[in-house]
Amino acid sequence: MSEQPFWQQKTLDEMTDAEWESLCDGCGQCCLHKLMDEDTDEIYFTNVACRQLNIKTCQCRNYERRFEYEPDCIKLTRENLPTFEWLPPTCAYRLLAEGKSLPAWHPLLTGSKAAMHGERISVRHIAVPESTVVDWQDHILNLPDRAR
């Protein structure tokens, strides 16, 4: 009988830093700029990528020093996770916090990011560089809800 994977054995609070980091599927959705409606506080995703996001790989160009380059970059931690209602419905942190399973395409289950990209969960097919954007409201989008 095989042992359950760590994300089924532990709560988010019990995970090591390495386990916590490995939950990230690398989709890049959290690296897209968001807009907030001033009247309703509703959050809208855009397809505008952070300047540090390599759109092709969906990875941060300067992950270890990202806060130096992007002061508005937000670090997701165990402590502040409950305040991030804007996380996409496919996000492993959000799913596990809500008591749900990882989706079948998640790299921890498949061993690679190919299935995630194939399901078009990553932003590589929709993101545009921040430097090319004139009117941010023209870039509001709806992200896929494929958390299965």
From Swiss-Prot:
UniProt-listed Pfam families: CxxCxxCC
Disulfide bonds: none
Domain of life, source organism: Bacteria
Record-linked InterPro entries: Puta_zinc/iron-chelating_dom (IPR005358), UCP006173 (IPR008228)
Family: Belongs to the UPF0260 family.
Protein name: UPF0260 protein KPK_1978
Species of provenance: Klebsiella pneumoniae (strain 342)
